[in-house]
UniProtKB/Swiss-Prot annotation:
One of its GO terms (biological process) is hemicellulose catabolic process. Its EC number is 3.2.1.99. Glycans are attached at N295. GO terms for cellular component: extracellular region. This is Probable arabinan endo-1,5-alpha-L-arabinosidase A. Keywords: Carbohydrate metabolism, Glycoprotein, Glycosidase, Hydrolase, Polysaccharide degradation, Secreted, Signal, Xylan degradation. Belongs to the glycosyl hydrolase 43 family. Residues 1-19 form the signal peptide.
Amino acid sequence: MYRLLSVASVPLLASLVHGYADPGACSGVCTTHDPGLIRRESDGTYFLFSTGNKISYVSASSIEGPWTSVGSMLPDGSSIDLDGNDDLWAPDVSYVDGLYYVYYAVSTFGSQDSAIGLATSETMEYGSWTDHGSTGIASSSAKIYNAIDPNLIYADGTYYINFGSFWDDIYQVPMKSTPTAAASSSYNLAYDPSGTHAEEGSYMFQYGDYYYLFYSAGICCGYDTSMPASGEEYHIKVCRSTSPTGDFVDSDGTACTDGGGTMVLESHGEVYGPGGQGVYDDPNLGPVLYYHYMNTTIGYADSDAQFGWNTIDFSSGWPVV
């Protein structure tokens, strides 16, 4: 039988999980949700994009900060004609042929009426962004997936977008050679057949011979009003494959399309509900897992979510933080 836990009990339960390093240092504006991280090619400035405020973003000279506000990426919202086009989600940022690409999601909470859009800029400075609208990756109640939480990867000469949330979970679609639009139909990469199929926020990263499919599992939000049962809050899992397009398995060999997934990071110490993750190959630190989390000493509202990051050790063949 499931029961809701009081907020006061969460730090005690989280402290029972051991073995994870604390998040790296962060100063300045450290509130974020579904972060997207990149370092500008021209001068090494870091930019961090976030769900909310029509994609809010901050910048800093170091991953540790101090982070200062830049503003909204698309202050007029998205040109995509869907509810939620003024409340954009889950930015994913990449550098493509001299332009910074930020993919974003347009949707409303719990809806499949969703689409993935794109904005580009040469500099990432405030006011420099061009909204290209929809990439053609979209969903409705007639689909078996939800077209949110985009992530771009370039592999073997092809761009792919990974996306999806609940329903049939994580999908992938090949993109055109200039990745502004989908090139063909999508296919499934990961699926949890149990419960509410609570997987989303995928991020693919190549290291060595493997492609690692990170994703967030569990309940993301609203902890201040409805605390999940212990272990059902957000946490980060991974599967891997030698191909970017399928056959992902966890460390036990269970297929990611059949509920497989190896734990990467979960609640511990003052960290609660880590997720919305990405991986950045930092020139000084090496691979870094970045994410949002609730600091139990600050609060559990969505607006309290903090920027977290840890270096990744791949020496075992699996990511360890």
